[in-house]
Amino acid sequence: MEKRTSLFENGLIWFGAGVSIAEILTGTYFAALGFGRGLAAILVGHLIGCIMLFLAGVIGGKTRKSAMETVKDSFGSHGGQLFAILNVLQLVGWTAIMIYDGALAAGGIFTVGHWVWCLVIGALIIVWILIGITNLGKVNTVAMAALFILTLILFKIIFFDGTVVAFITDETFSFGAAVELAVAMPLSWLPLISDYTREAKEPVKATAVSTVVYGVVSCFMYLVGMGAALFTGESDIAQIMVKAGLGIAGLLIIVFSTVTTTFLDAYSAGISSESIFAGLKGKYVAVVVTVIGTIGAIVYPMDDITDFLYLIGSVFAPMIAVQIADFFILKKKKSETGFNWCNLLIWLAGFILYRVLMNIDMLLGNTLPDMVLTILLCVIVAAVRGRKKA
């Protein structure tokens, strides 16, 4: 009998996804808005992003298909492969970014060379992959409990031991841009969530638990980053830990949070690759992705990822919008064609619209209006085609 994951196990997986150095670093940007507006942007952005994340997870959970297999239902067997390739590329990028950030922060506490930390983190991710998602139970529970306690200590140091410092607000960083930066993080997990909800005993409940846990933890991480910049005047998390005397404990936060998050990226890259080439074994592709990501983290500087996050949004926001329209509104059956050109053209229109909206300062960012308009376009096109057939 196939082993299924419990609600608790799914919650742990997405807790690990949320506890991330990259999320803390992204949170530091929000200090430019001040605490009140910064917190509002974090909450609004995560609410938008997590609703989309939930809907994507429900599609995969109900159909028992991986994220990229569900994409084929809307875009055709070959059209879906286009998104699988784009997803693998973004996951290789994420793997490299996460290892780079983790190694940089770990090096700030215990200096042995950036490349050494890249290799250590990369090796631990490979161990996580080889253990496998359905066998991680007790290992993940211990790691998550330790991370949670240490993160609370970090929160206490920042918010209760620090004092507000003079932080120069950035007038060019608008509330809408901040919302978009908050939406971008849950949106980046959108092409992955079904890889985990499809394995759940209760897929819809597991999706709800996963989304809520990730949303709360991710907001908390953003808040820690923003608080670090506002209350300590320091955006380098490693230095905050050093000054607080966390030392080895801080090192553990950095290394294990990087491992538990990046494991999901590499694992899903493997699952997505199975949608491109049926003969590939996802677990071994995930190992290869980790190796490539480790090399990338050693060789290339990856300090500013905002453009990368916006690129992810422009590709995957209109993609899930088409899927939401097909699955929940139009209730279309699986596309039997190689390329569903109609949906691919709607996605392209959504992609272009997102890039255009990036030049317009909108209060709620560009993801929400882009997705609403893309869904509306799907419904209109379906109605017009239905009339022609009638």
For the regions a protein language model found, what residue spans apply to each?
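C-terminal membrane-solvent junction of multi-pass transporters and transport-like membrane proteins
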Residues: 170, 321-390
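Extracellular loop-to-transmembrane helix junctions
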Residues: 28-58, 72, 79-81, 214, ...
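Transmembrane helix-loop boundary segments of multi-pass membrane transporters
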Residues: 29-40, 44, 104-118, 134-143, ...
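Membrane-water interface regions at transmembrane-helix termini and the short interhelical loops
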Residues: 29-32, 58, 97, 101-109, ...
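Membrane-interface "cap" regions at the ends of multi-pass membrane proteins
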Residues: 1-37, 135, 174-179, 191, ...
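Membrane-interface loop-to-helix entry segments
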Residues: 116-158, 169-170, 207-214, 309-321, ...
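Hydrophobic transmembrane alpha-helices that form the core helical bundles
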Residues: 80-112, 259-275, 318
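Transmembrane alpha-helical segments of multi-pass small-molecule transport proteins
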Residues: 13-17, 83-88, 109-132, 144-155, ...
